[in-house]
Structure formats: structure tokens, C-alpha cells
């Protein structure tokens, strides 16, 4: 009995904090174009959803249940990563438009590729190929 009471108190204490983390992560992964933000925050989102799911028998949640949020995060990870890649490429395109020289334009697209390469292991083969294809097409367009 004592163990359950402690678990419930812990769950009630942690739930609001984990909900805030979950909300912050959701907002960041849906808006950022920085891979150093996107990938760690997506992992934190899944971890936090799992934590919330583990305490759901002690705390009532309104709206979507934490286990469902975790399932959606796992199922939609590839699509979310693709959306992120396209946002990141858009940022590179904007930078290239502002650049005055072909070298400056190319450096925007090279930076796009270089920043994403370390994260290939965290994305599907299709998304890694998308990054490479976007880079190759952009370099072709500027005559590189």
C-alpha cells in the first residue's frame, strides 16, 4: 500500500513537468530547421511520452492519452523528419538567394548537407536519400 501511495505522489508531481517538456518538444520539432535541435528533441519527446504513459494509471489525463501520443510519435517519425528536412532545405534556399556569388550559394547547400550527415543514422534511408537529392539538385541548378 505504501509503495502505491509513493508512486501516485511521484506521478502527480512529475506529470505537469513532463507535460510541459512534451509540449515544448512538440513545438520545437514542428518549427525548427536546426538538426541539432530537431533530433535530440524528437528523442526527448518520445522518452517523455513513454514516462507519461508509465504513470497514466496513477494520473488522469485529458485529451489524447500518453500511450497514444507515444505511438503517434513513433509512427509519424519518418514524416516529421521529412518535414524537418524540407524546412531545413528552405532555410538553405533563402540563404542562397541572399548570397551574391555562386560560391556563397553553394556554401549554403553544402552546409545543409554537412549539418544533416551526422544524423543519417537517425533517419530512414528514404529521408537520407532525400537530403542527398535536394543537395545534388541545388548544386546542379547553381552550376556546380
Name every feature range the model reports, one short phrase each.
Residues 2-13, 73, 80-84:
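TPR-adjacent "capping" and linker segments in tetratricopeptide-repeat scaffold/adaptor proteins
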Residues 4-50, 89:
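Short terminal alpha-helical segments
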Residues 1-6, 59-61, 142-143:
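Short, aromatic- and cysteine-enriched interfacial helices/patches
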Residues 26-27, 40-122, 130, 135-141:
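Long, low-complexity or tandemly repetitive, helically biased scaffold regions used
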Residues 1-9, 100-107:
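Short Lys/Arg-rich cationic patches that frequently serve as NLS/NoLS or arginine-rich RNA/DNA-binding motifs
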Amino acid at each position: 500500500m505504501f509503495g502505491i501511495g509513493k508512486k501516485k505522489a511521484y506521478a502527480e508531481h512529475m506529470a505537469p513537468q513532463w507535460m510541459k517538456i512534451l509540449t515544448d518538444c512538440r513545438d520545437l520539432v514542428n518549427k525548427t530547421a536546426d538538426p541539432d535541435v530537431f533530433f535530440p528533441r524528437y528523442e526527448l519527446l518520445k522518452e517523455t511520452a513513454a514516462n507519461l504513459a508509465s504513470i497514466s494509471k496513477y494520473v488522469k489525463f485529458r485529451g489524447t492519452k500518453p500511450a497514444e501520443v507515444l505511438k503517434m510519435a513513433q509512427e509519424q517519425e519518418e514524416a516529421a523528419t521529412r518535414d524537418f528536412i524540407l524546412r531545413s532545405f528552405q532555410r538553405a534556399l533563402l540563404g542562397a538567394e541572399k548570397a551574391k556569388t555562386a560560391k556563397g550559394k553553394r556554401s549554403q547547400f553544402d552546409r545543409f548537407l554537412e549539418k544533416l550527415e551526422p544524423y543519417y543514422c537517425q533517419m530512414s534511408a528514404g529521408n537520407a536519400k532525400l537530403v542527398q537529392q535536394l543537395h545534388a539538385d541545388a548544386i546542379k541548378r547553381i552550376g556546380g
